């Protein structure tokens, strides 16, 4: 938001609660699912544990779809309720519509990390998150400063960064299954 000035930074601050909800849905499903997975696995019920992982994955997919549609089509109303108006509403809407289209990346990016930890991959969970953060930072600079894509570029960098986290997590989880 800084390259756009005060309006860009204000937009990120007003829109962040929406992004936080997307990430918290993934984290909630991932944390709850990974705890149940560990309980079942510790009890010796490997089959049930794997079924629970599959169920949590489907739940993340379902919530991703619902959140994508809901946030995309109600973004202006949500932003208005959060206090956006005028230029902030316009910029926020531009930002959140991109974020909404990448909801699946946000939900899975945060939702798979707890499973990685419970598969014994705490280091890989950290690596996945660092890869996502680094990608976001590099692409923020590229999209916003170099290419001048503004809020659209900032949002695109965010969802691509989450996509990188998700990709590393998916590869790790697929190998461990």
Predicted regions: what is each one?
Residues 1-20, 87-91, 151-154:
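Interfacial/gating helices of multi-pass transporter permease domains
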Residues 120-127, 151, 155-156:
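Short, non-helical or kinked segments that cap or interrupt transmembrane helices
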Residues 9-69, 106-125:
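Small-residue-rich hydrophobic transmembrane alpha-helices
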Residues 37-104, 138, 146-177:
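Short alpha-helical transmembrane segments in multi-pass integral membrane proteins
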Residues 3, 68-72, 133:
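Recurrent gating helices in multi-pass secondary carriers
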């Amino acid at each position: 938001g800084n390259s756009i000035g005060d309006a860009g930074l204000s937009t990120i601050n007003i829109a962040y609660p929406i992004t936080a909800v997307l990430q918290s849905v993934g984290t909630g499903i991932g944390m709850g699912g990974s705890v149940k997975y560990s309980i079942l696995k510790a009890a010796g019920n490997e089959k049930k544990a794997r079924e629970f992982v599959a169920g949590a994955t489907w739940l993340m997919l379902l919530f991703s779809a619902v959140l994508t549609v809901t946030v995309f089509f109600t973004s202006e109303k949500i932003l208005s309720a959060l206090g956006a108006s005028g230029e902030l509403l316009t910029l926020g809407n531009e930002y959140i519509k991109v974020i909404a289209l990448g909801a699946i990346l946000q939900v899975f990016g945060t939702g798979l990390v707890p499973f990685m930890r419970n598969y014994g991959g705490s280091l890989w969970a950290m690596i996945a998150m660092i890869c996502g953060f680094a990608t976001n930072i590099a692409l923020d600079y590229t999209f916003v400063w170099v290419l001048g894509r503004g809020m659209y570029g900032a949002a695109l960098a965010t969802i691509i960064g989450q996509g990188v986290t998700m990709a590393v997590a998916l590869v790790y989880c697929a190998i461990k299954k």
